[in-house]
Amino acid sequence: LDQRNPEKPFKLSISFKAPHGPFDGFAREFAQRFEEALIPLGATANPKEAARQPEFLRNSLEGPRGWEMAHDHGMQSKTQKLLRDYHRLVEGLDKGIGEILAELDRRGLGGNTVVIFTSDNGHLHGEHGFFGKWLLYEESIRVPLLIADPRLPAKDRGRSSDALVLNIDLAPTMLALGGVPVPAAMQGLSLTPLLSNPSLALRSSFFCEHLYEHDVNSPVLHIVPSEGLRTKNWKYIRYIKNPGPEGEQLFDLAADPQETKNLLTDPGAAEQLDILRKEYERLRTELGPHQSWSLKPAR
């Protein structure tokens, strides 16, 4: 900011590592925060939910730590320490963001600067019997997204939207907010219409994937690659290297937002399964060959 031309607009991108491992990497000023707190896990962090997962997932990199957390209901001291440390990292992040906003105000820029806050992934803390960010469950794929535009009229501020939006929408949104034309080649959509009309539906579905496998030679260090299709009310997941019934999942998110009942073989969901499979296959073909990769390729 000291070096910017005050006569021109600026775009500043700030990336925080937190909250990310090592989870005890928080600033020492937060070391006593949450010390007496008992932090609960999500509703699906329980033995029953963990046990229903297919073996290839339970034995993968996400499984053992999440299994342990789910089976002790998060009450073990080391689980509570991890959760407290995670919250300490988030508090440090919150403080850092506050300092940035205060600095913008100090420079007289706060009233003319759009601030966008988001994250690159969610995180499972024992939910469904997993720990990490590698699977397509809601806890893993959903992230916060806040857009604060001081130019908006008061009636359009502080509103929320349940529209399906993606990280690829951020670049078109920033261009549009800055009055720059959005190139037709960009796959994302500008989110600016949502700022005045949060109920607007920008898309009806999206394709999602996680193809990084880490170490394909080790079951306990292997991340199971997956792809899926998410609509407003349904989610279809396919574990692309695990064919057969256990390699697919179908969830009715309207009736089962916690994703506890796989409807893959439910006759009542057969029509919806067929629709989602066909749309998945269409997008899969459009994307071309899989690009899965690993730090340690198969021997």
Predicted regions and their residues:
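Intrinsically disordered, low-complexity polar regions and short flexible loop motifs
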Residues: D256
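Conserved SAM-binding loop
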Residues: L89, D252, T265
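C-terminal cap/loop subdomain of S1 sulfatases and analogous C-terminal strand-loop tails that border
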Residues: N121-E127, I168-A171, A176-Q249, L253, ...
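A general structural motif at alpha-helix termini
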Residues: L195, L264-P267
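Short amphipathic alpha-helical coiled-coil/interface segments
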Residues: L276-Y280
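Carboxylate-dense, calcium-coordinating segments in secreted/extracellular and ER-lumen proteins
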Residues: E259-L263
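Active-site-proximal cap/lid insertion segments
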Residues: L1-K8, L12-V165, L177-A185, R238-G244, ...
